[in-house]
């Protein structure tokens, strides 16, 4: 399959913002894609060489190396590339322009660098893989030579997208939801098989692999997909509510209630002595927790199992729960053995999704929990999450306050009904989180995605100091703006913010962003931040829940304040408009109750 085809479609995709048009173009590309390399086509669209869970290195090519490779490929001095970059602001565009110059074309032809055969997807992928895997002494030269060789053979348009891919700025604005719609339409003629594709992807979070199965075996083959050790399952997510009586009613009157620990959610896979640990974002974090790997080998009584829990920092002396920030300190340590001693951890397990080749995701929670309890040998490092079963609101609240006093964030209230399956990759009311109140503030924080930024005034003049934040809408695969956040940042965080944002600056709005506001700069949706505020309120400026409450108005966070970056969350894990709408309704109900009490 020619890489030229992908480059041409990337060029078309970049020029449109309608999701329907994006899906139609992508459908067309998948129809033309070689069945043997469609997995690689999907990875390239996602802006990666392989799924994150493999833990392989990223390309590791900085701007200076890219400039050098381009200069070698087109036979000009590095200064020429740098000058063009100042004018254009996009190395991909620079590479394309320089490839079009008569000097570049004639010299390369004379050198025999341009053959009659164009680049193939396989050849391009192989070269990019070589660049990513190069390490140690001489790796810098290998990366430069490999990339320069690839760019020499590439057409101007191919060079543009190869450079953008390597630079981490592909900018085609396509999310996984759009890819799944396009796969369904390309291979079945409609989106009716999208739920089956999504179910398979949720159980085996490798969209390239799913695409290859569809292309080679047909979409019906996905019905046989089940969890597999080594490939993470997309995590089940909880809804949020603040009224304990309503929560119990929502889950059917009876619930399993777990502590909600302030740690790192981890999905742990074991097959014989092989252990893998994946983060909430499905990244391979095994090397960060060699102590947990040993605990699993020693205390989990199963040959093949996938379990889920929270890795929590504990005090080395008292074994009491420590804040999440201590895990972050541990991750920053270069000496992992020293980190283990200084920041020990316990693991609090709460679910089981695979046991000895049997898929447990479709079994009710009580059955999953029973099996989880059976596979853990008695020990003081791996624990079942502290929990109760209850149908009583008072007992729920007593347990909630017990959780808070013991260092937890709150509790997770979980349905124990017959339909209490593990909803991989979905957010629903089978699990509901109840977290502590923030006094006069919102009942809960929200996790929002940075989509743009504004320059400050006064002492913050010339600095990007206000962020345009958005919620993720899974139904439309778009980001709806919620608020502008300017408070809560320390001076050090503000300084770090400048670099962070300029690295992901875009020339125009990302196609997935739905905004009425025009920030000073647009950025690629990449970072998730936890935000707290006074309340959820109506706003004519923002697009989140637009027209749902009042015509012409959306919902916004009043007096928003930055709490922390949520590096453990992907942008698709951000708070949804539906959740924000529910929080707004909670506020209205609370005010009505207070008014009723005052009148009484």
Curated annotation (Swiss-Prot):
UniProt cofactor(s): Mg(2+)
Enzyme class, spelled out: ligase
Activity regulation description: Inhibited by PCNA123 and PCNA323.
Keywords for this protein: ATP-binding, Cell cycle, Cell division, DNA damage, DNA recombination, DNA repair, DNA replication, Ligase, Magnesium, Metal-binding, Nucleotide-binding
One GO term (biological process): cell division
The protein's Enzyme Commission number: 6.5.1.1
Keyword presence, Magnesium: yes
UniProt keyword annotation of Metal-binding present: yes
Binding site for ATP: 258, 265, 280, 310, 350, 427, 433
GO MF term (any one): DNA binding
Superkingdom assignment: Archaea
PROSITE patterns, alphabetized: DNA_LIGASE_A1, DNA_LIGASE_A2, DNA_LIGASE_A3
Location of the active site: 260
Any coiled-coil regions, as ranges: none
Catalysed conversion reaction: ATP + (deoxyribonucleotide)n-3'-hydroxyl + 5'-phospho-(deoxyribonucleotide)m = (deoxyribonucleotide)n+m + AMP + diphosphate
Entry similarity comment: Belongs to the ATP-dependent DNA ligase family.
Cited function: DNA ligase that seals nicks in double-stranded DNA during DNA replication, DNA recombination and DNA repair.
Protein name listed in UniProt: DNA ligase
